[in-house]
Amino acid sequence: MANLFLAHRPRRMRKDTFSRRLMCEHVLTSNDLIYPVFVIEGENKTEAVQSMPGVQRQTIDLLLKTAAECVALGIPAIALFPVISPDLKSLNAKEAYNPSGLVPKAIRALKHAFPDLGVITDVALDPYTTHGQDGIIDDHGYVRNDATVSILVKQALCHAKAGADVVAPSDMMDGRIGAIRSALEQHTYIHTRILAYSAKYASAFYGPFRDAVGSSANLGKSNKYNYQMDPANSDEAMKEVALDIEEGADMVMVKPGMPYLDVVRRVKETFGVPTYAYQVSGEYAMLKAAAQNGWLDEQACVMESLLGFKRAGADGILTYFAMDVARWLK
């Protein structure tokens, strides 16, 4: 075999650990992680989420123990998602802005115990409506945009008053970021940040989450196509992100994560703003199921998937693996 002269041998730099480390372009750390948690009423109680192995709904007292672990592991923030009792759900979602409700109670407890832990709250009505939609509906089941926004503003103010560091509207109503920002300013909550779910797709990967918060049965066979985005579109995402930034969002989100990393990349390159991605319940469930069946190495695949988020441009990642990942990184 003739000797080949190769001016370029990229494999040279991949030969040893030290040189691979020196040219590593992206690094995942605990600073990149946000831990989503499901909170329920009561005391000293947990409920397993069957479609999300390893994930539990938990009462506020147990949530404080989880938060303590997050702090010890260096996780900067948690995201609260409430499981609302069926008897508190209504057509007008009045419980969403109850100052004595589950979310405000959880916020106050968390901020009292862990003032430096970031608390992010979900601003959306689907946990509170009897029909499982993210807003107020008309007689035909269509979500009324402006009527919904007025409720979302009340909800965001309720969370801010309780001490939330970040309110995160996930509803995809038009104009809600501007309305919430204006209300926060008027009520002197000038430091309350807005994480806008700017590009939230009408995805099939949300199923286990809806089980977790108890909205799946309410939604039934209905869908959210008239406000969440078509998975076929990415130009539309750019428009949505631009509008949210203009209206006062501090951070923007792409959801789901892995199937939409091209959108994450476009958002980061186009706008250069803090950009977040959500490794949603369906993504979590797929990886968990494959690992439990011995088909995949859980740690290796989770770490690779999250590194892909970072490579695409995500500044932070909401993932149900956050605590596991933080431990692995130790």
Go through each PLM region and give its residues.
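N-terminal [4Fe-4S]-dependent radical SAM core
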Residues: S19
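Alpha/beta enzyme core
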Residues: A2-L4, H8, D16, L28-I34, ...
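Charged, low-hydrophobicity low-complexity segments
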Residues: C24-E25
